[in-house]
């Protein structure tokens, strides 16, 4: 299965609509009105000053039905984007390859203007590395969420009780060809990006070379359940609700959460075509302000039940509330024994975490995805070394636009980062990443291609 193959846009692109409903006076984290009923209607916010001055009133954003998309969907359904004068169309994408192909087209060509992205897809699109050489300059504007991802393992391997630390299972996985007639098979949803990196890091930390000791496959999120059920894959890395759906359907179990691997790590990001942003600076700020309010709303515990109901709608995730709500409330089962973490902060967070801002696009964090690309020898033509990665990252990640939108929105100064890093990041295996010394991080890794 190759996600780099071109896709038929008409076959995969679905347009989601929403109509205005009851008006409420709400600032991001207030008490919610009645649910929109699973994505069939929209709540109108009071219109903000300046909303009529935008260069454009519409934008089309793509998303994949996993929790990282929640702020985009909630921003649309709860009227936060409309409050700032924008009619945001959120368009479900069949795969990351479909999203890539559609942003190349742009909305004027029947595609999308941007949306939710695994990293470093925006940087790679900017350089034409994943678009057959066609450069599509992109800007990264905000981080959509932290955590909310996991690594699920087939129930056929329940006796092995694979967990966060794989060292005890190393011999079992290395000897898999002798015991099972093939290499251990693991999957992710798109190559050379977030979920590929998470599963590679997990294996490598356990002394298992993901390029030599196992077989890695690309499988879209929605197909992971069936592929694990029929034995095509032994484990996979993707965003919830799919790992939890595997456990709920008793097909597999969650061996590890990415939030355990790297607490409060950056997950997926909002990125737009640079030409759209450059042409519509006011609309870009309006989009960011609406997103920020949506992220604040998403982070309120009192709103998680309604959030689950909205996301469960057929137009969006098409997954039962009974699966979505526990994850959003931090009731996540991990391990072969299905132990419940019961920790709200272990689930997806959208606005703030114990490490500070979730939404802010720290350049030091977006850089990690490019450094990890260098680690595995990906896209050497555009990422030959750390200096090239830093230069590309500085061009693509727009901290300045986030800061401007936050100030305009009235976000407290204490919640607006002024630096480009959170300091040193520590992984579960003791490895540290200092964004100011990325080469030292690379040198500290035992299994790598760099």
From Swiss-Prot:
Domain of life, source organism: Bacteria
Any one cellular-component term (Gene Ontology): plasma membrane
Keyword ATP-binding: no
GO biological process: monoatomic ion transport
Chief site of localization: membrane
Post-translational modification: Predicted to be exported by the Tat system. The position of the signal peptide cleavage has not been experimentally proven.
Entry's localization field: Cell inner membrane
PANTHER family: ALIPHATIC SULFONATES-BINDING PROTEIN-RELATED (PTHR30024), NITRATE_NITRITE BINDING PROTEIN NRTA (PTHR30024:SF7)
Protein name: Bicarbonate-binding protein CmpA
């Amino acid at each position: 299965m190759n996600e780099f193959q071109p896709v038929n846009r008409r076959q995969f692109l679905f347009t989601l609509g929403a109509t205005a409903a009851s008006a409420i006076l709400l600032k991001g984290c207030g008490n919610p009105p009645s649910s929109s009923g699973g994505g069939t209607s929209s709540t109108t916010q009071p219109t903000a000053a300046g909303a009529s001055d935008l260069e454009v009133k519409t934008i089309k954003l793509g998303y994949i039905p996993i929790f990282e998309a929640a702020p985009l969907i909630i921003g649309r359904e709860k009227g936060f984007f409309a409050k700032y004068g924008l009619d945001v169309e959120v368009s479900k994408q069949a795969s990351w390859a479909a999203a890539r192909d559609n942003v190349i087209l742009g909305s004027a060509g029947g595609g999308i203007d941007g949306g939710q992205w695994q990293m470093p897809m925006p940087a790679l699109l900017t350089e034409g590395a994943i678009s057959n050489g066609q450069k599509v300059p992109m800007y990264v504007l905000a981080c959509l969420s932290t955590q909310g991802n996991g690594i699920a393992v087939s129930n056929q391997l329940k006796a092995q009780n694979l967990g966060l630390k794989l060292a005890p299972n190393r011999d079992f996985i290395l000897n898999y060809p002798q015991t099972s007639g093939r290499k251990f098979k693991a999957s992710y949803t798109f190559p050379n990006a977030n979920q590929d990196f998470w599963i590679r890091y997990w294996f490598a930390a356990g002394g298992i070379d993901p390029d030599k000791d196992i077989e890695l496959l690309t499988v879209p999120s929605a197909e992971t359940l069936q592929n694990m059920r029929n034995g095509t894959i032994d484990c996979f890395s993707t965003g919830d609700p799919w790992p939890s759906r595997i456990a709920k359907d008793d097909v597999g179990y969650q061996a590890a959460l990415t939030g355990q691997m790297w607490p409060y790590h950056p997950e997926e990001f909002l990125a737009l075509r640079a030409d759209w942003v450059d042409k519509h600076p006011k609309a870009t700020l309006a989009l960011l302000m609406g997103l920020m309010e949506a992220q604040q709303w998403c982070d309120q515990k009192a709103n998680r039940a309604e959030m689950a109901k909205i996301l469960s709608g057929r137009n969006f995730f098409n997954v039962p509330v009974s699966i979505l709500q526990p994850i959003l409330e931090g009731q996540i089962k991990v391990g072969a024994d299905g132990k419940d973490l019961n920790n709200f902060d272990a689930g997806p967070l959208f606005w703030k975490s114990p490490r500070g801002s979730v939404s802010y696009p720290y350049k030091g964090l977006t850089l990690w995805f490019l450094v990890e690309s260098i680690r595995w020898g990906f896209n050497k033509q555009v990422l030959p070394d750390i200096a090239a990665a830093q230069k590309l990252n500085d061009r693509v990640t727009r901290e300045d636009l986030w800061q401007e939108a936050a100030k305009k929105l009235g976000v407290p100064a204490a919640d607006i980062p002024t630096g480009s890093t959170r300091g040193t990041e520590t992984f579960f295996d003791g490895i540290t990443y200092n964004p100011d010394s990325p080469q030292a991080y690379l040198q500290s890794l035992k299994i790598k291609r760099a």
